[in-house]
């Protein structure tokens, strides 16, 4: 019995030593492989739009909507076919709604990103993702993706319309987006999460205060005249889509393989495999905090993979780098230039 207890204790110690702690150097948290031809430095600020992989081929001529971020940094998006821009909320998380036409994603205070999930996710116009406060990224399930915004926690959310709406970010950094087919821009809420609606038309994604990213997923995205291509520091510019920048739109910078949002938070894959913005430094237990690139096709990649998964959580999606459940769909996170309209 004493021997068994010693083995268990040793295993626990080994696990704790392997986990990332905020005091450790986070810039070394990189995947072992890199994307062939990927660009690790991009001189311009850009957004992202959630594009369902199943509809990518048919939406090559369209622009996805930007993702917004909410305050928490999460990224979210609605589920509309038209992809809406993703916004970011305050916590930095990224989320998206489930509309077929993705609605624009905005960011709420926790940083999460949300967007609608509409089916019509148009790559040509791609709506910007916004960020909420928490930094998380989320999206609605509309076929036309709606724009993703960011709320206060940084989560990112966006609608899931097919026309990709811009993703916004809410305060927590999560990213969210609606699920409309037309992809809406993704916004970010305050927590940094990213969210998006599920509309098919992709709407631009926005960001709320928590860092989450949110965006609608409208499938049909509107086409914006493109200005002179943004300069890059290595390779050929792969970013061919653009969207109008608005308040709350998830704005990102890529330098040396490190991805940051407009609040300077670090884009990372956290312990539960979710994509969101935190810190610096990234949250304890983070798996990757570096190794980001833009692929020759114009998609965001971590290591050698450019496939992410939007997984339904209530009325929005969270973004992950792995398939974690039955309600998850494979998506690309299309990089889009943000322009003043």
UniProtKB/Swiss-Prot annotation:
Pfam families, alphabetized: PIR, PIR1-like_C
GO biological process: fungal-type cell wall organization
Compartment(s) where it occurs, according to its Swiss-Prot or TrEMBL record: Secreted, Cell wall
Site feature (Cleavage) residues: 63-64
Propeptide stretches in the record: 19-63
InterPro entries listed in its UniProt record: PIR1-like_C, Yeast_CWMannoprotein_PIR, Yeast_PIR_rpt
Entry superkingdom: Eukaryota
Keyword Signal applies: yes
A single Gene Ontology CC term: fungal-type cell wall
Record's keyword terms, sorted: Cell wall, Cell wall biogenesis/degradation, Cleavage on pair of basic residues, Glycoprotein, Repeat, Secreted, Signal
Signal peptide: 1-18
Intervals holding PIR1/2/3 repeats: 64-82, 83-101, 102-120, 126-144, 145-163, 164-182, 183-201, 202-220
Free-text description of this protein's post-translational modifications in UniProt: Covalently linked to beta-1,3-glucan of the inner cell wall layer via an alkali-sensitive ester linkage between the gamma-carboxyl group of glutamic acids, arising from specific glutamines within the PIR1/2/3 repeats, and hydroxyl groups of glucoses of beta-1,3-glucan chains.
UniProt GO MF annotations: structural constituent of cell wall
Annotated site residues (Covalent attachment to cell wall glycan) in this chain: 74, 93, 112, 136, 155, 174, 193, 212
Written domain comment of the UniProt record: The PIR1/2/3 repeats are required for the covalent linkage to the cell wall. Their number varies among different strains of S.cerevisiae.
Family per similarity comment: Belongs to the PIR protein family.
Task of the protein: Component of the outer cell wall layer. Required for stability of the cell wall and for optimal growth. Required for resistance against several antifungal and cell wall-perturbing agents and for tolerance to heat shock.
Designated name of the protein: Cell wall mannoprotein PIR1
Gene that produces this protein: PIR1
């Amino acid at each position: 019995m004493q021997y068994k207890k010693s083995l268990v204790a040793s295993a626990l110690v080994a696990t704790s030593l392997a986990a990332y702690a905020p005091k450790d150097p986070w810039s070394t948290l990189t995947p072992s492989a890199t994307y062939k031809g990927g660009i690790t430095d991009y001189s311009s600020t850009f957004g992202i739009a959630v594009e369902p992989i199943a509809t990518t081929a048919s939406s090559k001529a369209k622009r996805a909507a930007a993702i917004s971020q909410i305050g928490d940094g999460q990224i979210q998006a609605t589920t509309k076919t038209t992809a809406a821009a993703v916004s970011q909320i305050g916590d930095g998380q990224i989320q998206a709604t489930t509309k077929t036409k993705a609605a624009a994603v905005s960011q709420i205070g926790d940083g999460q990103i949300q967007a609608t999930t509409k089916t019509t996710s148009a790559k040509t116009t791609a709506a910007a993702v916004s960020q909420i406060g928490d930094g998380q990224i989320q999206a609605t399930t509309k076929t036309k993706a709606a724009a993703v915004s960011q709320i206060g926690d940084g989560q990112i959310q966006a609608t899931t319309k097919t026309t990709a709406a811009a993703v916004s970010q809410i305060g927590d950094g999560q990213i969210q987006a609606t699920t409309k087919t037309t992809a809406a821009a993704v916004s970010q809420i305050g927590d940094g999460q990213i969210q998006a609606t599920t509309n098919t038309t992709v709407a631009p994604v926005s960001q709320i205060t928590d860092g989450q990213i949110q965006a609608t997923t409208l499938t049909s995205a509107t086409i914006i005249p493109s200005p002179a291509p943004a300069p890059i520091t290595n390779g050929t510019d792969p970013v061919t889509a653009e969207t109008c920048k608005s308040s709350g739109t998830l704005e990102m910078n890529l330098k040396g393989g490190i991805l940051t949002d407009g609040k300077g938070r670090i884009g990372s894959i956290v312990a539960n495999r979710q994509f969101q913005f935190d810190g610096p430094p990234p949250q304890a237990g983070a798996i990757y905090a570096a190794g980001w690139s833009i692929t020759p096709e114009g998609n965001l990649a971590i290591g050698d993979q450019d496939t992410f998964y939007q997984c339904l959580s209530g009325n929005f999606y969270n973004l992950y780098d792995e398939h974690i459940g039955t309600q998850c769909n494979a998506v690309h996170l299309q990089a889009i230039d943000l322009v003043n309209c």
